[in-house]
Amino acid sequence: MVASRAPRSESPWLKKPMHGVSGSTAMASTPWSSMPPSSHSLGAQSQLVCSGCRNLLMYPAGATSICCAVCGTVTAVPAPEQKSSCNVHENKERLKGNTNGFRAPQRCARRVDGACTQVAREVHTEVALVIFTLLCVTLPGLLFSLG
């Protein structure tokens, strides 16, 4: 006789009662379901550039440091009230008008939560070149085809 398998939805590692939710039928499908509910489980996340490999990292809001899964570097998360020098807004205004005065942003990256954080110049230069290309090559061609 062949033993029958439990239906996939009844596997204990796929659905576990959430810790701290007593008398509820709330279920979680992650291996972290035994952790108490936090801002991470509610979906509040931020982004930061890894100080080692420059990959974009997503992390739960409120974290103080992040360990990169790619290179293993631990990057400190700046406090929300910590502001760094930021010239992105200045460059955005410059790009709206004349691109002759174009300068690549050098000092900050915008996080999802609105704070600024220090990153390498190479990251900004690549982003700035993409923006410059879109404004100078793609946009005029699009406007010409519409007109």
Curated annotation (Swiss-Prot):
Nucleus is among the record's keywords: yes
Signal peptide per UniProt: none
Transmembrane domains' residue ranges: none
Record's compositionally biased regions (Polar residues): 22-38
Key words of the record: Nucleus
One Pfam family in the UniProt entry: zf-LSD1
Residue pairs linked by disulfide bridges in the UniProt entry: none
Positions of region (Putative zinc finger): 47-77
Compartment(s): Nucleus
A cellular component term, taken from the record's GO annotations: nucleus
Keyword Nucleus applies: yes
Residue segments, region Disordered: 1-38
Function description: Putative zinc finger that may be involved in programmed cell death and defense response.
Protein name in the entry: Protein LOL1
Protein's gene: LOL1
